[in-house]
């Protein structure tokens, strides 16, 4: 049940209407936060992601004493204060160095979270690539390669795919301009081995009989997510279709998935609801059109008891008493009147 806030003036009313649920939702705004300890590599990675999300992104520079998996109260406060449904929290410590935590919100409450551990050795920022920069507000194409993303059971990799799609989605549009397809984001997952297989919680499962405990394996042995960004250039090929070339634009990031928080089923069901538009034509059952354009309908009725059917009874259709006795058709009935009255004759036709 969503809470209702009563506006006090016209200005607050307009602000609430702007945040109210809509049939076509506004683009998701992403808020970038940093913890009390955040390495320079993590800050550079957040700056690169912020540059790719500009127009629909906000960034805080001050340190925040926040631990998302322990207490998410501050995240809910910042989400409601800034009207943000996506968050990227950067932190770094001895146990989990160079960590980016992606958070999705619904109704200003945490829906799900996932940790990405950045590899500092292979990371390259956008400034290290001597190529043309991506225009602000441009929507990318996305490619996910790897069997880990195709798992029928929700796990950390399927959640990572869903979060990255939400992160790079941008403004919704009905039409696609070919000239606007300027860059592509490619996310590749290494093939998991038997020793690095994970369960739905993103953690290693319990060992099978006769096998070593996978939980004792070094976290660096888990499958890697490789994120690459390429620019697209079309050149003449002498044929109808142009020749397409790609050039790496940056950033270049390699991640390992860490802790995750799965969404609550009831909250996820509420978040996935889609409102019906008034223009959407509703299909009516048992109604069709024939070749001439006439509307044909089918109705289903139960059995009717014809013995209790009420019909219209006319006075002229009533059967006479003498007709039942086999009398003549034309006869004269003598009606005895009371004492002192004359006898009256009435002609009755049977």
From Swiss-Prot:
GO term, biological process aspect, one: ribosomal large subunit assembly
Protein name as annotated: Ribosome production factor 2 homolog
UniProt domain Brix: residue ranges: 28-266
Record carries keyword Cell membrane: no
Main location: nucleus
Molecular-function GO terms, alphabetical: rRNA binding
Keywords, alphabetical: Nucleus
Ranges of Polar residues composition bias in the record: 192-202
Keyword Nucleus attached: yes
GO cellular component terms, semicolon-separated: nucleolus
Protein localization: Nucleus, Nucleolus
Lineage, broadest ranks: Eukaryota, Fungi, Dikarya, Ascomycota, Pezizomycotina
Annotated spans, Disordered: 192-219, 301-350
PANTHER family recorded: BRIX DOMAIN CONTAINING PROTEIN, RIBOSOME PRODUCTION FACTOR 2 HOMOLOG
